[in-house]
Amino acid sequence: MKLLKRLVSVFAIVLAVGSNAFAGDEVRIVIDEGVDGARPIAVVPFVGSAPEDISKIVADDLRNSGKFNPIAVSQMPQHPTSAAEVNPEAWSNIGIDAIVIGQVVPSGNGYSITYQLIDTVGASGTPGTVLMQNSYTVTNKWLRYGAHTVSDEVFEKLTAIRGAFRTRIAYVVQKNGGSQPYEVRVADYDGYNQFIVNRSAQPIMSPAWSPDGQRLAYVSFENKKSQLVVQDLNSGSRKVVASFQGHNGAPAFSPDGSRLAFASSRDGVLNIYVMGANGGTPTQLTSGAGNNTEPAWSPDGNSILFTSDRSGSPQVYRMDASGGNATAVGGRGSAQISADGKTLVMINGNNNVVKQDLTTGVSEVLSTSFLGESPSLSPNGIMIIYSSTQGLGKVLQLVSADGRFKASLPGSDGQVKFPAWSPYLTK
């Protein structure tokens, strides 16, 4: 048995600043469209009880990816508690080729979580083979994290893609009233364990993660002007890195974390600049007619996507990271490239989230929600979070990159916008 604490050292950093600033009204996933075309799988209810339902969390994670469609407990032909009890034929007869079983039992001041992933059709050689198994000891506080760890391991074993269920999201909440209605918050990717990073009487916009997950850059209108702030999530310390005349916005860390791209109208026209992540003299990358904003780095750091209306209406362009050689990509704005460099996600002219295959140029609409904004990819490129308008307010939406699964994360205490998905927070 290994202690899960060994795995959470980096992840725990993002909890430190929020330890005394817990936000009680969390955003939670509400399913809008299911995953009927995805791979069926069974997550059998784990034996034992704990403050969190481990098997439900695992099933929800797998469903949220769009890759799997966990069957209902009522459809399961048996509830085995160990590999020896599994009847492979009973599962294969209903189209299930893999099942997850496990148990959760008290252990000291926490719980021991044990699971097995079992092949029921013999794809690995023999039906009933244990494909993966593991055991963790966690405190009550880390029970959901323990479940997400199971999900990550099962997902990677079955898809050969690293799981991203132990990542987090940052976003801005504009509360309904109060002296400091604007807040930057961070939560688990599914909306749980939310806490406040910073609150202000003035607007806050566009949080962006550093590639090591230890800092957030965002726009603050404190002192009645737009400033770029970088905040350390371990210590809580904040530093204003850009406070130039005019507007300063849309920060984006370079892939190595050493630089910030941002938009500024310091010279009267909104252009893209780059400077050190701790501030310094900026280098201007764009020029000429039109406004240029929303920079986003390519994974290799060699190019930058941005939004410009230089041609008369907003669309996405791509240029060298040093400036120059700008070419139109399409869409309307808010572009981001997946970590493997193969897929572009952006907002199109109808305010829908679309993905574009950068090899073939083929685009696919993933959302048809009203006024989609600020799409952000999970680090494995499997899920996308964005904001949209519902009624008179803003909410977060989750969609799998294949479009199979759609869900909303409504906030109960205000408008929720500017989501940003963290990088991986574990080694």
Curated annotation (Swiss-Prot):
InterPro entries the record matches: 6-blade_b-propeller_TolB-like, PD40, Tol-Pal_TolB, TolB_N
Chief site of localization: periplasm
Pfam families: PD40 (PF07676), TolB_N (PF04052)
Domain of life of the native organism: Bacteria
Family named by the database record: Belongs to the TolB family.
Key word Heme present: no
Alphabetical keyword list: Cell cycle, Cell division, Periplasm, Signal
Subunit structure: The Tol-Pal system is composed of five core proteins: the inner membrane proteins TolA, TolQ and TolR, the periplasmic protein TolB and the outer membrane protein Pal. They form a network linking the inner and outer membranes and the peptidoglycan layer.
Keyword Cell cycle among record annotations: yes
Annotated localization: Periplasm
Entry protein name: Tol-Pal system protein TolB
Gene3D superfamilies membership: TolB, C-terminal domain, TolB, N-terminal domain
Signal sequence annotation: 1-23
A cellular-component GO term for this protein: periplasmic space
GO biological process terms held by the UniProt record: cell division; protein import
Cited function: Part of the Tol-Pal system, which plays a role in outer membrane invagination during cell division and is important for maintaining outer membrane integrity.
